[in-house]
From Swiss-Prot:
Its EC number is 7.6.2.11. The complex is composed of two ATP-binding proteins (PotA), two transmembrane proteins (PotB and PotC) and a solute-binding protein (PotD). It is a peripheral membrane protein. Belongs to the ABC transporter superfamily. Spermidine/putrescine importer (TC 3.A.1.11.1) family. Residues 6-236 form the ABC transporter domain. This is Spermidine/putrescine import ATP-binding protein PotA 2. InterPro entries: AAA+_ATPase, ABC_SmlMolc_Importer, ABC_transporter-like_ATP-bd, ABC_transporter-like_CS, Mo/tungstate-bd_C_term_dom, P-loop_NTPase, PotA-like, Transp-assoc_OB_typ2. It is found in: Cell inner membrane.
Length: 363
């Protein structure tokens, strides 16, 4: 088995009484697009700074390709960082910006020229080497910053929220650019973001962080569909969180009491015990709405009324208030020609989902 490129072992970083990173351990593989995801203050940027060498852990160790990085200065690590601010020299051309770290390292001019040319090709800016940064779009400037980081051929590229300053359309375009670039150059990317959609779109694996700890480390599809905690379910995308109590366990099915709604079946996802408090996490797109629902033993359904709706173009978000006052968010596609919405505010509906559409987590 190939050893991991990066090993983070029991790393802790404190600032006075505040623990920014709390006993974090994880491994990152060669060629992986790995994302540290979490809200502000969760510790993701502090962890990134320790990987770069800008900060040091109070305890634990960080190993890159087997080497302990303790005491290794940032400029001596085979690691480069791309920041949100680009940090380009305004008085230098694009090519000169990219060449700068090579000149500082004393690389021969002939090799500098060849590597700058290749870096420009890698980021699809081969014809922009003579331009000044002010003559480029925001997305192009970000690509120059990435090219400058890649030109030294690092083993590891760290990206600290590099797309957050771009508008929504450009962010989507740059996400595709980053995916293609990472595949082309084969360098391991460690990406920091608070944007859940960005993390889901870009990553091979995601570490969801909360209060200095890793709450879940999995592939994007697993994190979205099978969150391990209430926090992960709530933080990743839209999710209905229904408090419940385990009533009985029968093989792979669990009978739960949805407080105020009654007993329903759900798929067993942890070693649930009768009487244990739990939360049914249910994505809005898993719920269907109808004026009436035909009884089905594998479905859960409740009566309610459309309380609010939000037209989003390709889908409409319906807020359905159930008979006990609980509210469910439901997403339905707007696929009917000439009809934007299926229901209006005030319409009586039934909300239904398959028993295995939700995912149970401990309360």
């Amino acid at each position: 088995m190939t050893p991991p490129l990066l090993e983070i072992r029991n790393v802790t970083r404190r600032f006075g009484d505040f623990t920014a990173v709390d006993n974090v351990s994880l491994t990152i593989n060669t060629g992986e697009f790995f994302t540290l995801l979490g809200p502000s203050g969760c510790g993701k940027t502090t962890l990134l700074r320790m990987l770069a060498g800008f900060d040091q852990p109070d305890s634990g160790e960080i190993r890159l390709n087997g080497q302990d990085l303790a005491g290794v200065e940032p400029e001596k690590r085979p690691v480069h960082t791309v920041f949100q601010s680009y940090a380009l020299f305004p008085h230098m051309s694009v090519a000169q910006n990219i060449a700068f770290p090579l000149k500082m390292a004393g690389v021969a001019k002939s090799e500098i020229d060849a590597r700058v040319e290749q870096a420009l090709k890698d980021v699809r800016l081969a014809d922009k080497g003579g331009r000044m940064p002010t003559q480029l779009s925001g997305g192009q400037r970000q690509r120059v910053a990435i090219a400058r980081a890649l030109v030294n051929r690092p083993r590891l590229l760290l990206l600290d929220e590099p797309l957050s300053a771009l508008d929504a359309k450009l962010r989507e375009e740059m996400q595709i650019e980053l995916i293609n670039l990472q595949k082309d150059v084969g360098i391991t990317f460690v990406y920091v973001t608070h944007d859940q959609g960005e993390a889901l779109a870009l990553s091979h694996r995601i570490a969801v962080m909360n209060q200095g700890r890793v709450e879940q480390l999995d592939a994007p599809e697993t994190i979205y569909s099978f969150p391990r905690s209430r926090f992960v379910a709530d933080f990743i995308g839209q999710c209905n969180l229904l408090d419940a109590t385990v009533e009985a366990v029968d093989g792979e099915r669990v009978r739960i009491d949805l407080r105020g709604l009654g007993e329903v079946q759900a798929l067993k996802s942890f070693d649930a015990q009768p009487g244990e408090a739990c939360v049914l996490t249910l994505r809005p797109e898993k719920i269907r709405l109808a004026q009436s629902v035909t009884a089905d033993s594998d479905e859960v359904h409740f009566r309610g009324r459309v309380a609010e709706l939000l037209y989003l173009g390709d889908v409409t978000l319906y807020i359905v208030e159930l008979e006990n006052g609980e509210r469910l968010e439901t997403l339905l596609p707007n696929a009917t020609p000439g009809r934007a919405k299926f229901f209006e505010v005030g319409d009586a509906v039934e909300a239904a989902w398959r028993f295995d559409a939700g995912h149970l987590v401990r309360a």
